[in-house]
Design a protein with these regions (language model features):
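ABC ATPase NBD coupling module
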Residues: 63-79, 103
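A short, proline-enriched helix->beta-strand linker immediately N-terminal to the Walker B motif
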Residues: 148-152
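Glycine/charge-rich catalytic "coupling/switch" loops of P-loop NTPases
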Residues: 258-307, 324, 332-357
Length: 357
């Protein structure tokens, strides 16, 4: 069975962890929640860094822990990337990478050294001392080192949390490429909705040590009854395909049933599948399709649900013609002026779209 199965109960002082979820052992599953929700503790239990008082951790049918059996961390085939890169300070970048890689028998290495170096863009850093790396460079090296141990599971504990906004934006494309290139399932801890939207296939929502819900990320991101939809950076993920390129205005059109959106020109073949991220704050609503506006992205939609965020704002869940869902954040005044109600047909005006893959 190709699943990650977790069912653990553990006391950490006054904090009680009671977590149960099952997720496919492929792609990226994000563990999301506020600080103190138990995300890192779950990851540490899966890694064997803490031994849960009770429960089971099973990866692809292989039991790593149950009430009678416990596999120590060093015998679990996993890679772990911490919030701050834990590199050996006395070794160069190359030596850090080779440390774990050389411990794997050559016939068991699933990832080529040069491939990992190229994918993470760290070729120019190989002979550099780790003390001379920026925060973003250190994390890329740490990720490459984890990959080169040929893990069956990659655990990433808020790997971007210590980076500034610019460094985060620089490293996200590497993480996106990583999960496209290698068939290694990942559990990714984050409290940033933008990271989750860009990287996750599935989502486990945690609150006060318990699982609120888990499932498909695109669906859960747009559930207005869940706290993630109320974050300032709340976003939706839409899937489509490259429908056309506009060389005059350097745009690429991403088509979906019933509409299309434009992104900055990308060198992608027409017909190729694509995913885009749309921030809820970048989606306004209109009763009519307008041509006398600077907004060129308009998608016909139906109002599914609304939820008050604060006394002045609402979050609106929309369903597009192809069944995909989209969030919009608008003022209560605007909603009242439009006569907004469940089932209403209208147009979503999308100011900005980010291509993910």
């Amino acid at each position: 069975m190709s699943d990650i199965e977790v069912s653990i109960a553990h006391a950490l002082g006054d904090f009680r962890l009671e977590v149960v979820f099952t997720t496919p052992a492929k792609g990226v599953t994000a563990l999301f929640g506020h600080s103190g929700s138990g995300k890192t503790s779950v990851l540490r239990a899966i890694a064997g860094l803490i031994r849960a008082d009770h429960g089971t951790v099973k990866i692809n049918g292989e039991v790593w822990q149950d009430d009678r059996h416990f596999v120590p961390t060093h015998k679990r085939p996993l890679g772990y990337v911490f919030q701050e890169a834990s590199l050996f300070p006395h070794l160069s970048v190359r030596q850090n990478l080779e440390y774990g890689w050389r411990q794997i028998p050559a016939d068991q290495r699933k990832i080529n050294f040069d491939t990992a170096v190229e994918l993470l863009g760290i070729g120019p850093l190989l002979e550099r001392a780790t003390s001379r790396l920026s925060g973003g460079e250190r994390q890329r090296v740490a990720i490459a080192r984890a990959l080169l141990t040929s893990p069956k599971l990659l655990l990433m504990d808020e790997p971007l949390s210590a980076l500034d906004h610019g460094a985060k934006q620089a490293i996200l494309p590497y993480l996106e490429s990583l999960h496209d290139e290698f068939d290694i399932p990942s559990l990714y801890v984050s409290h940033d909705p933008n990271e989750v939207a860009r990287l996750a296939d599935r989502l486990v929502l945690l609150e006060k040590g318990k699982v609120v819900t888990y499932g498909d990320a695109a669906n859960l991101l747009t559930r207005v009854d869940l706290p993630i939809a109320r974050y300032d950076d709340a976003a939706s993920i839409l899937e489509g395909y490259v429908s056309a390129h506009d060389p005059t205005f350097h745009l690429t059109w991403i088509g979906m049933h019933g509409g299309r959106v434009a992104v900055s020109r990308e060198d992608m073949a027409v017909g190729k599948r694509a995913r885009v991220e749309i921030q809820a704050r970048d989606v306004s609503l209109s009763l009519k399709a307008h041509s006398d506006t600077s907004i060129i992205n308009m998608l016909p939609a139906r109002v599914v649900d609304t939820q008050e965020i604060n006394p002045s704002q609402l979050i609106v869940r929309l369903e597009l013609d192809d069944g995909q869902t989209l969030l919009s954040r608008i003022t209560r005044r605007s909603a009242m002026g439009m006569g907004l109600h469940e089932g209403m047909r209208l147009y979503a005006q999308v100011k900005s779209v980010a291509l993910i893959a």
